């Protein structure tokens, strides 16, 4: 192995072939050292030396990039390029169209015979056909994915900025006395962590030899993940009594003409045309084009579905290779569910998220007022009744502001040290009364791997919160059962992909995109969007059982909606608007605290501490 590459691997850094050719000659001439290159890459929050990063590094060093000799092929062969195939479609008319369809390599199917026939026209003109495609990298506002030495996405390459030290408090001297005249109701603890990522035994694929294609192990892991997703969600869809005569896509060519069939598969692509929507759907046996007309009663629901979601269509298969659908189905929540027996006494859970300790916009005074409230310093009889029966506090991620999460973050921090941020958080949470059990999950600002699911915090950074005796650390996502009611806890990054893909949905009303995620029964279904997904061999983001409460955060805006009996809550934040949020038009609603009656699994009150924010 080349000494240059070997040195980078020892430092846990990867390099792309194009970047290697740009840098190798200058490295051999002694123009820069491995240490300089690694420091530069780390400052750019990347563990992979790409050609763009290499070019930028050379410019900083005052060196001209040396371009590699052009070749006809790529650096890594993917085999022969696939030919474009032409299709014709018909749907009750004789109007003609022709559309070019590029077939991509399948993650999950074993392949199906390419369709040779051209489809009859339905007078369809693609919307946005003349628009230029935009790459799905960092250019379009997505977050850079950072990888560890095995190629797995992980969290955090902190910014290395030499600045003057800041003086700050870690709340060591904070005292919040419990109201001596306040009496708490003794309620027996009854909780169980039903699902936690750490409790799932995964067997990642192994490289058989060192001569495999670049990234082969990652591709196989993602293929396994999508097969797992399809299997889990197919099982949920099959529970719908309306789905009869389900046929594998690879067997569609054997169905009788005009026979109504149902298919279940992953959404590879979705396109809007003049007369409806065209999907490419894939299962383990093959792929098929599906046309859903605009006059279908399910058109609006189908329009909102994300790529990589698992759906079902019912319709008639044409021998020309198209399924003409008249019904569309999501895994969704059943219309009727068995009611759970009532509890013998009232007990409440508090939902919060996005505390962002360490940020200069952290609403310190408001959070201290909240802690005082938990300690019995209340103003009304109603609040006294509620706080006396609060038994659980659930925190859905971003408990600290982190370090190096976004460019220029250092200027927004009062506590610039990640260790001290967690110590400050632990000092604050130590004032939560000991009879209240806290559940704490990580988010994208926390010291945890960036890709979801996030198993837990990195203990070397977050050790202080692990020492809290009344704290239970959970994964993102996780399911906890409180007195027989299931709470799905997820930080909520999947909301970003829904808002970015479905017109009319915004961050300002996060309850609606949360409903869409629940309908798809997945925390973050879209692959390659704004949310990095870890290449686990099993999809742990599927919502396999319908919860009673879905609790998310991330978008810093409070909202609560009920969908088919399920209470969905976004618990906002404890951070006022930052300069970065102003630039991206995020208007937070800080210091809102929803209180959930565990018996009914519904929000019964929203406390407002924003007056101290």
Swiss-Prot record:
It catalyses: DNA(n) + a 2'-deoxyribonucleoside 5'-triphosphate = DNA(n+1) + diphosphate; Exonucleolytic cleavage in the 3'- to 5'-direction to yield nucleoside 5'-phosphates. The keyword Nucleotidyltransferase applies. Its EC number is 2.7.7.7, 3.1.11.1. The keyword Hydrolase applies. InterPro entries: Calcineurin-like_PHP_ApaH, DNA_pol_delta/II_ssu, Metallo-depent_PP-like, NA-bd_OB-fold, Pol2_small_arc, PolB_N. GO terms for molecular function: DNA binding; DNA-directed DNA polymerase activity; single-stranded DNA 3'-5' DNA exonuclease activity. GO terms for biological process: DNA catabolic process; DNA strand elongation involved in DNA replication. HAMAP family: DNApol_II_A_arch. Heterodimer of a large subunit and a small subunit. PANTHER family: DNA POLYMERASE DELTA SUBUNIT 2. Possesses two activities: a DNA synthesis (polymerase) and an exonucleolytic activity that degrades single-stranded DNA in the 3' to 5' direction. Has a template-primer preference which is characteristic of a replicative DNA polymerase. Belongs to the DNA polymerase delta/II small subunit family. This is DNA polymerase II small subunit. The lineage of its organism: Archaea, Methanobacteriati, Methanobacteriota, Thermococci, Thermococcales. The gene is polB.
């Amino acid at each position: 192995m080349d000494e240059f590459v070997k040195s980078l691997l020892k430092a846990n850094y990867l390099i792309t072939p194009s970047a290697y050719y740009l840098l190798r000659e200058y490295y051999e001439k002694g123009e820069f050292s491995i240490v300089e290159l690694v420091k530069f890459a780390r400052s750019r929050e990347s563990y992979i030396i790409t050609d763009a990063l290499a070019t930028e590094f050379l410019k900083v060093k005052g060196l001209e990039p040396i371009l590699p000799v052009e070749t006809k092929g790529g650096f890594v062969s993917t085999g022969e390029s696939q030919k474009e195939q032409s299709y014709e479609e018909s749907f009750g008319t004789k109007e003609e169209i022709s559309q070019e369809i590029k077939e991509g390599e399948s993650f999950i199917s074993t392949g199906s015979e390419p369709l040779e026939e051209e489809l009859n026209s339905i007078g369809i003109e693609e919307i946005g056909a003349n628009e230029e495609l935009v790459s799905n990298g960092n250019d379009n506002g997505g977050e850079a994915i950072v990888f560890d030495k095995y190629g797995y996405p992980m969290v955090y390459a902190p910014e290395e900025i030499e600045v003057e030290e800041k003086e700050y408090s870690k709340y060591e001297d904070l005292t919040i006395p419990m109201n001596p005249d306040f009496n708490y109701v003794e309620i027996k603890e009854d909780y169980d962590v039903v699902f936690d990522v750490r409790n799932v035994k995964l067997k990642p694929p192994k490289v058989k030899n060192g001569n495999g294609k670049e990234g082969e192990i990652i591709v196989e892991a993602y293929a396994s993940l999508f097969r797992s997703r399809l299997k889990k969600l197919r099982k949920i869809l099959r529970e719908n009594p309306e789905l009869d005569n389900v046929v594998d896509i690879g067997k569609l060519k054997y169905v009788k003409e005009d026979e109504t069939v149902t298919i279940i598969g992953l959404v590879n692509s979705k396109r809007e045309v003049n007369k409806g929507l065209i999907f490419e759907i894939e299962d383990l046996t093959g792929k098929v084009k599906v046309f859903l007309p605009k006059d279908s009663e399910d058109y609006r629901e189908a329009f909102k579905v994300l790529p990589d979601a698992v759906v079902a269509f019912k319709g008639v298969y044409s021998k020309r290779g198209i399924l003409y659908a008249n019904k569309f189905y999501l895994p969704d929540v059943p219309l009727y569910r068995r009611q759970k027996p009532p509890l013998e006494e009232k007990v409440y859970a508090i939902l919060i998220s996005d505390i962002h300790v360490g940020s200069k916009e952290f609403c310190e005074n408001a959070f201290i007022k909240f802690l005082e409230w938990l300690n019995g310093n209340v103003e009304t009889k109603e609040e006294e009744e509620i706080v006396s029966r609060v038994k659980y506090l659930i925190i859905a991620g971003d408990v600290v502001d982190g370090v190096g999460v976004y460019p220029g973050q250092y200027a927004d921090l009062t506590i610039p040290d990640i260790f001290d941020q967690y110590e400050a958080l632990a000092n604050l949470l130590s004032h939560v009364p000991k009879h209240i059990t806290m559940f704490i999950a990580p988010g994208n600002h926390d010291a945890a791997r960036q890709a979801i699911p996030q198993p837990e915090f990195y203990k070397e950074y977050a050790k202080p919160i692990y020492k809290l005796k009344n704290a239970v650390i959970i994964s993102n996502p996780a399911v906890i059962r409180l007195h027989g009611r299931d709470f799905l806890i997820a930080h909520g990054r999947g909301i970003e992909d829904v808002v970015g893909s479905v017109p009319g949905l915004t961050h300002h009303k996060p309850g609606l995109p949360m409903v869409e995620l629940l309908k798809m029964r997945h925390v973050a279904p879209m692959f390659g969007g704004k949310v990095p997904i870890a290449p686990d061999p099993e999809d742990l983001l599927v919502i396999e059982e319908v919860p009673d409460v879905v609790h998310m955060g991330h978008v810093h805006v409070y909202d609560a909606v009920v969908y088919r009996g399920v209470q969905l809550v976004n618990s906002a934040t404890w951070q006022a608007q930052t300069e970065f949020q102003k630039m991206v038009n995020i208007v937070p609603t800080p210091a809102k605290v929803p209180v959930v009656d565990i018996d009914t699994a519904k929000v019964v009150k929203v406390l407002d501490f924003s007056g101290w924010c």
